[in-house]
Amino acid sequence: MVASGSGGRLKPLVWGLLLALLLLRVVLVACMPLQPAGADPALLLEAASSPELPLELTGTLLGDPRSSVGTASCRALLQLPVGRTELRFGDCPPLQEGWRLRVRGRLRRPQASPHPLLAAPAERLARQGAFSQLQVQDFNVLERPATPVADLRRRMAQALVRQAGPDRGGVLAALVLGSAVVPVPAELREAFRASGLSHALAASGFHLSVLLGVVLPLGARLPQPARLGLAAAAMGLFVLLAGPQPSVLRAVLMGALALAVLESGHRSRPLGILAASALALLLARPDWLLDVGFQLSVVATAALVLSARPLELGLRRWLPGWLPGWLAAATAVPLAASLYTLPLQLLHFGVVPLYAVPANLVVAPLLTPLTLGAMALACLAVLLPPLLPLATVPVDWLCRLLVLVVQAFAELPMAQWQLGRPTPVLVLLLSLALLALVLPALGRRWRLLGLGLLVVAVAVHLSLLGADQLLLVHQGRLDLLVARHRGRAALVSSSADGFSCSQASQLSRGLGVQRFDWALLLDPLAPEQPDCWRAQAGLVLASADGSLPLQPGQRLASEGLSAAPVAIESRAMELQLGRWRWLLLPDRQALWAWQERYGPGRGGFDGLWLGFRPSQRERTQLQRLGVERMWLSGAIPLGWPETWAASGPSGSLQAVRG
């Protein structure tokens, strides 16, 4: 009896240890830096002394060429015998997924991110197994093999877009195929994101549940093998159309396990099925642990399993009795998902869609019939094309209503609450705090502990946001300087092009800046996208005809932040944030003009930024200033003093006070 009891206690311990070892393996493999394989063309760049290399490659397209957001270029992924590379075209050529090509062009390394808050091609491509880019100069199509799945997707998407237009047609196609397969117009996609409805366009468990909700009742009277075969066919078709994305495979695997458990006569345990599905996928692909879509999919599903029902019961007690009972159930689902995914949204985006719960509540009655309608239209596009125009009319009305609701929520004040991206430690504290507050099995003591952790995390994050900070981001010819004082922020940019504005927008979201007080553009050329810059700052000063945006005697200022020119006919500026005084010298002419006016020995600055590489003589002169910090944009020169800092070819520097 003793031996039997001991064995019974030992068995859970062994299983727990095995599970911990598996999870440890997944984490270690996922966190290992991705490297190109032995014969990957990226290795040729490492051996070459030039940043670019003329090269000819042969491979298979992994997708149709797609326009890059915010640029006029076009890109597609090419599968090589070993490894992958991204093809870059000036204009999108009429090429299709599955075609074999011979391409000639210049191979280069994808640009790395200069700052953790900025997205860059290098990180995006590494997750796709590519470590190089080829700027295509010429190409030949070698083979056009049959690609029935890609042709089916393309036919469905083109038919829906042709009938309902690029906006609503893109939404209808995304409801069937997912936004990862069908590009939705950028402005509309941003509206879905701002309103907290991005999940509606991403192929996920919701779309699979809608599909199975139609298929399973149709096979209810069939024998069990036929019933399971029908469900398996529906799930297989879903994977074929939406593609083997992490969130899609998670939903399908979880649905298959749940169906198998129910058909075997056992009681389904959703949390166990979710854990088993996620673990199985991570064992096969450990890198998916860092995939944002997979993280959000698993966490949102866990929220529905663990807390949707308790939240519904709590809302029923809290809401007035005259409100309909279904309101509590309808509110509990998006509320649980929003609470559980809040740490991930802050970690990855630094933005919270403030109206996500009411937006989901309003569109909930539309999504299921609209998804079913879109699926029916996709089938008609393939099976009975002549009926498609007539059948599209009612579905298009529903889609028009959905788009209007999404745009209305996206245009509300503070639709995207930019709190900034907290440090991973604060995200961990926030996660623990929310779990202690929302898990129904925990008692009052845990709730008080969670509330305390929440207060600590918020207080620390707000103190970091309120400190005086200066951030330099350097990337190629781009320099961005973000000055912050007590939660306010101002921007100085060396360039006024659209890419610089896009980078500034990403920085503002990640830093928790709703809007810059002012933006000073030192580029002698007029801004490429003035509307973009005006959206970033309350006041934008830029050159219109090659003249300087600020003349001597003028001053650009807001509370605790100011910029003023320090020399005639130059871009030399004095930047003040709080009690800090920084001298900004974007080019050598600015240094000469400043020295001509004040002489080489004038100091009194806390820091100095150089946008160019100084000569040895200039370094000696600058050392006499005795500034606390000396920053350089670019690579570290030989003989550079150890106390001075350089951003590197693509990097950033940051100073914090208070």
Predicted regions and their residues:
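Hydrophobic alpha-helical transmembrane segments in multi-pass membrane proteins
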Residues: 12-24, 134, 184-356, 373, ...
